[in-house]
């Protein structure tokens, strides 16, 4: 009788795209290295000829991307886990801020744009944030 064991590892990759169907997202280039307790600003600017929704995703080491913040309303400040961002349409921006970083904030951060009712996301290239001990 033949017996075989097989181990399969599935790796999911997030591919970042700067420009999709006339839309583009640019964000702070990384890596960004800051000390614990420092403040953070990651810039995100977009271009699109359509109305859109903006998002920040975070991807921790060995994990998939997770939604951090989303904006559906202009000039509304969104907050989660100490992070905040405001969609400023006149500046085409959705900058991510945190006043006091923790070591656990080390991750890759992606700004994303979804055009109107479309399910397609246009992603920034991602910004690696490394938070170090003081």
From Swiss-Prot:
<keyword id="KW-0393">Immunoglobulin domain</keyword>
<dbReference type="InterPro" id="IPR007110">
    <property type="entry name" value="Ig-like_dom"/>
</dbReference>
<dbReference type="InterPro" id="IPR013106">
    <property type="entry name" value="Ig_V-set"/>
</dbReference>
<feature type="glycosylation site" description="N-linked (GlcNAc...) asparagine">
    <location>
        <position position="134"/>
    </location>
</feature>
<keyword id="KW-0732">Signal</keyword>
<dbReference type="GO" id="GO:0002250">
    <property type="term" value="P:adaptive immune response"/>
</dbReference>
<keyword id="KW-0391">Immunity</keyword>
<keyword id="KW-0675">Receptor</keyword>
<feature type="region of interest" description="V segment">
    <location>
        <begin position="21"/>
        <end position="114"/>
    </location>
</feature>
<feature type="signal peptide">
    <location>
        <begin position="1"/>
        <end position="20"/>
    </location>
</feature>
<keyword id="KW-0325">Glycoprotein</keyword>
<protein>
    <recommendedName>
        <fullName>T-cell receptor alpha chain V region RL-5</fullName>
    </recommendedName>
</protein>
<dbReference type="InterPro" id="IPR013783">
    <property type="entry name" value="Ig-like_fold"/>
</dbReference>
<feature type="region of interest" description="J segment">
    <location>
        <begin position="115"/>
        <end position="134"/>
    </location>
</feature>
<keyword id="KW-1279">T cell receptor</keyword>
<dbReference type="GO" id="GO:0042101">
    <property type="term" value="C:T cell receptor complex"/>
</dbReference>
<dbReference type="Pfam" id="PF07686">
    <property type="entry name" value="V-set"/>
</dbReference>
<dbReference type="InterPro" id="IPR051287">
    <property type="entry name" value="TCR_variable_region"/>
</dbReference>
<keyword id="KW-1064">Adaptive immunity</keyword>
<dbReference type="InterPro" id="IPR003599">
    <property type="entry name" value="Ig_sub"/>
</dbReference>
<dbReference type="InterPro" id="IPR036179">
    <property type="entry name" value="Ig-like_dom_sf"/>
</dbReference>
